């Protein structure tokens, strides 16, 4: 027996340096990245800050996003997942440490026949320590996989926060546009009402027919319907805000118009920087590392396992004298799971296959991120051009409306010509506002696809 224990311990010493055999060196997946985004504009601006929305210089927007981040249940749930993953990582790490144990028992016995028939009371106690020597780094690989998963969970939380901030900013500006359009609709309704009063006076004097009178009334009804539509749209946005803030009142009230200042400049940077910015890509790479560690752990399961145990205990007829004569024991055991060669090969192949799948999915996510960024940057350029063109359209339509009004008052054109000019002018103004909103939302999208970042305010 002594020779057997000595042999087992000798094997442990011989195998102690073999842990590196089963660990695979991580190499980032090779992907072909362009040197720069095709639609990136040269800029001396610094990279987007973590709290990217503060670059707009709108304290009310800052307060809205701060409240959403503080109250959102999805973000709170993500934080709970982070804490749970961290606890699981700690639990996996404890497997590398000696595991203490102990037992305490007491009992009584009495013979059923014979003499003497006195009761015999006995007690025993044992303190034990077990330690699995991680010869082939199986436990270390499992711990690393759990740590990577915990880190990935933190990136998931940051991705939720980034998306939440983007959603809040988008809703904020949609509500601003809704209020702006409502005010514009009220002004248009008043202008149309004054036009109708002019036509009504002309009709009573016989200057125009009932056709012009009905056209003026139709235009007024259309503006009243439009005002009602905008009121409904704002009510729906307010309900969405109520859900976002869980019923809390929006801090600072509602924005009444879209911001008119220049948009914050964004330095797009190199595509490779996406890996360091986007939390979803960081999470994907961390899970790639976790899958590699899990694959190594699956392989290491089929290597010999050596466990050491030690105990200190005693037994006595008297509980107080339990450890008066302690008994110690030291043992070692080795299992040889590699003898099941068929199962080992299949499970190892399955683990490697899962890692290969994770590599493919990571590459897919990266290229999708590159495409999203190119699309957003291209839209930024085109939206700026469209806004300039729409500015000219609005200016010209306003001047055309003014000229047709003068001609109508002079009796040179029919009422319908003037009313159509008014409609085109209103549509041009609305289209310009819609483009402005699209630019703001595109700015949010760019910050999001570049991993604008988030830290607890």
Question: Can you say where each PLM-predicted feature lies in the sequence?
Answer:
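Periplasmic alpha-helical coiled-coil/stalk elements that build and connect Gram-negative outer-membrane
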Residues: 139, 154-270, 379, 403-406, ...
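Terminal intrinsically disordered/low-complexity segments used for targeting and assembly
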Residues: 2-70, 147, 231-276, 282, ...
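Acidic, low-complexity, intrinsically disordered peripheral segments
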Residues: 262, 377, 431-457
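Small/polar, glycine/serine/threonine/aspartate-rich low-complexity segments that form flexible
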Residues: 41, 47-56, 103-128, 142, ...
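Membrane-embedded beta-strand positions in outer-membrane beta-barrel channels/transporters
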Residues: 65, 124-128, 172, 271, ...
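Sec/SRP-type N-terminal targeting helices
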Residues: 76-77, 93-94, 133-161, 211, ...
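Transmembrane beta-barrel architecture of outer-membrane proteins
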Residues: 61-63, 122-124, 170, 215, ...
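A short glycine-centered flexible hinge/capping loop motif at secondary-structure junctions
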Residues: 203-207, 408-412, 449, 453
């Amino acid at each position: 027996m002594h020779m057997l224990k000595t042999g087992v311990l000798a094997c442990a010493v011989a195998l102690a340096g073999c842990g590196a055999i089963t660990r695979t060196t991580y190499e980032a997946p090779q992907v072909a990245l362009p040197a720069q985004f095709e639609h990136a504009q040269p800029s001396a601006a610094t990279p987007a800050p973590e709290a990217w929305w503060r670059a707009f210089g709108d304290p009310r927007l800052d307060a809205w996003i701060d409240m959403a981040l503080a109250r959102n249940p999805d973000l709170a749930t993500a934080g709970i997942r982070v804490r749970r993953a961290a606890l699981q990582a700690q639990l996996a790490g404890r497997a590398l440490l000696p595991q203490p144990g102990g037992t305490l028992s007491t009992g009584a016995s009495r013979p059923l026949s014979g003499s003497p028939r006195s009761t015999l009371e006995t007690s025993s106690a044992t303190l034990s320590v077990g330690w699995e020597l991680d010869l082939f780094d199986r436990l270390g690989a499992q711990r690393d996989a759990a740590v990577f998963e915990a880190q990935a969970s933190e990136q998931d939380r940051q991705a939720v926060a980034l998306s939440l901030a983007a959603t809040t900013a988008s809703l904020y500006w949609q509500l601003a546009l809704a209020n702006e359009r409502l005010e514009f609709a009220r002004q248009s309704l008043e202008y149309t009402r004054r036009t109708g009063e002019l036509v009504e006076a002309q009709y009573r004097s016989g200057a125009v027919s009932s056709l012009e009178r009905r056209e003026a009334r139709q235009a007024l009804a259309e503006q009243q319907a439009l005002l009602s539509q905008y009121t409904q749209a704002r009510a729906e946005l307010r309900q969405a805000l109520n859900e976002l803030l869980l019923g809390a009142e929006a801090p600072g009230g509602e924005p009444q118009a879209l911001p008119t200042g220049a948009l914050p400049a964004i330095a797009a940077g190199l595509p490779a920087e996406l890996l360091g910015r986007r939390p979803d890509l960081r999470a994907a790479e961390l899970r790639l590392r976790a899958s590699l560690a899990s694959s190594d752990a699956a392989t290491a399961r089929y290597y010999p396992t050596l466990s050491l145990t030690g105990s200190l205990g005693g037994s006595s007829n008297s509980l107080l004298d339990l450890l008066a004569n302690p008994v110690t024991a030291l043992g070692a055991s080795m299992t040889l799971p590699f003898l099941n060669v068929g199962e080992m090969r299949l499970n190892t192949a399955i683990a490697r296959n899962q890692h290969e799948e994770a590599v493919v999915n990571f590459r897919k996510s990266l290229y999708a991120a590159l495409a999203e960024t190119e699309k957003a940057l291209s839209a930024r350029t085109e939206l700026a051009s469209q806004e300039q063109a729409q500015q000219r359209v609005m200016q010209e339509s306003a001047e055309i409306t003014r000229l047709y009004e003068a001609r109508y008052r002079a009796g040179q054109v029919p009422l319908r010509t003037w009313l159509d000019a008014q409609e085109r002018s209103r549509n041009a103004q609305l289209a310009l506002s819609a483009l402005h909103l699209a630019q703001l939302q595109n700015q949010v999208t760019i910050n999001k696809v570049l991993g604008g970042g988030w830290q607890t305010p």
